[in-house]
Structure formats: C-alpha cells, structure tokens
Regions:
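Extracytoplasmic cell-surface/polysaccharide-interacting catalytic and binding patches
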Residues: 1-51, 58-59, 63-162, 171-184
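Conserved metal-phosphate-binding beta-hairpin within the catalytic cores
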Residues: 167
Length: 184
C-alpha cells in the first residue's frame, strides 16, 4: 500500500495509514477474486496499490494539495501540471470513493517474473497520460490498460476516466458512506 510509506506524491506516509494493509468490503473482495481467476488464465495477476482510504487520509491529500511550497515530488508525479490545478483537474478531491471500501487501485503483473506490465505511465501520475484511453500511450500499453479495464468491468467494477488503475465496485454496499477508521 503506497500511502503507508513515502513512495507517493507527497513523499511521506499519509495520515490514517498505520500499516500497509488492503481493506475492502466483502463484495469487492469477491469480485476481485473473480478478476484474479480470469487473469490467472493468462499468467497474469493483480498488484494492489490502494484499497480503503480513511477520510482523514483524503483530508491529508487535500491539505498537501493546498500547500504550494511542497513541490518535492513534482518531477515524479505531476511534472506537467501546476499543483494549484490538482483539484480543478480532478486529481485530488475533498472526498474519495476509496473511503467507502469498494474502490481499488491496481495494475497487472506477470506472475512468473513478478514484473508489472507496461501501462504507459506510473501509478498516481497526475497527467492526461494516465487517462485509460490516452492517445499518446504506446499501443501495447494501451492494450494492457484495456485488458485490465475489460476484465474489471466484466466483473462488476467501473473505471475512473482520469486514472487507468482506479476501479469502484458498481454495486458497492455503502454508496453514501465515507468511513474514517484507521488502517492498522
């Protein structure tokens, strides 16, 4: 879980992530089991970057985004965007579906090598290249994104238009809730 450590767009652990643990609703876990079973037919697996996100973590993201002085990870995570536009462009929000427990950030890996498949850009890159159908992404990376999206959608998830890695269970059990318990 990226936000339990410092390898993320803030460069530090995020409030609410006391452990690198993935928490999800039972419905999301069941759907992910079906996704993983399908990918295993191709020698692929899922790598999880983020699952449930406490509301206090979302507030931490928002506070970071409002601090114009903190630019230490700009080159890695938002090289082409002025930090002041992260809310406007939809990369940071005041509330997150992750706080409902049925949203997950994932990529594909080759199970033999453990290597991530080329997705045309890294996780959490705030850039149009992260859009699932970004035209500037190489054909193989776009095909990998579409494979991930197609299997996730076929198993009950819906994608986010700005992030190739982000999926929410369509029939999530807590659509109007935003939880704030710690990840331990």
């Amino acid at each position: 879980m990226r936000y339990a450590g410092s390898e993320n767009f803030t460069g530090r652990p995020i409030t609410g992530y006391d452990a690198p643990v993935c928490l999800l609703t039972r419905d999301a876990v069941a759907a992910l089991g079906r996704v993983q079973a399908k990918f295993s037919e191709f020698g692929l697996g899922l790598k999880v970057f983020d699952c449930y996100r406490p509301a206090r973590a979302v507030a931490d993201f928002a506070a970071w985004a409002r601090d114009p002085a903190d630019q230490k990870r700009k080159a890695d995570y938002y090289p082409n965007i002025d930090k002041s536009r992260l809310f406007e462009l939809g990369y940071i929000a005041e509330r997150s579906g992750h706080s409902r427990g049925s949203t997950i950030d994932v990529t594909l890996v080759d199970v033999r090598s453990g290597e991530e498949l080329d997705m045309g850009g890294p996780y959490d890159l705030f850039d149009k290249r992260s859009w699932p159908r970004a035209p500037e992404v190489a054909p193989q990376a776009r095909a990998n994104r579409m494979l991930l999206q197609d299997v996730m959608v076929a198993n009950g998830f819906r994608p986010l238009k700005e992030e190739w890695w982000h999926f929410t269970l369509s029939q999530e059990p807590h659509p109007d809730s935003y939880f704030d318990f710690l990840i331990r």
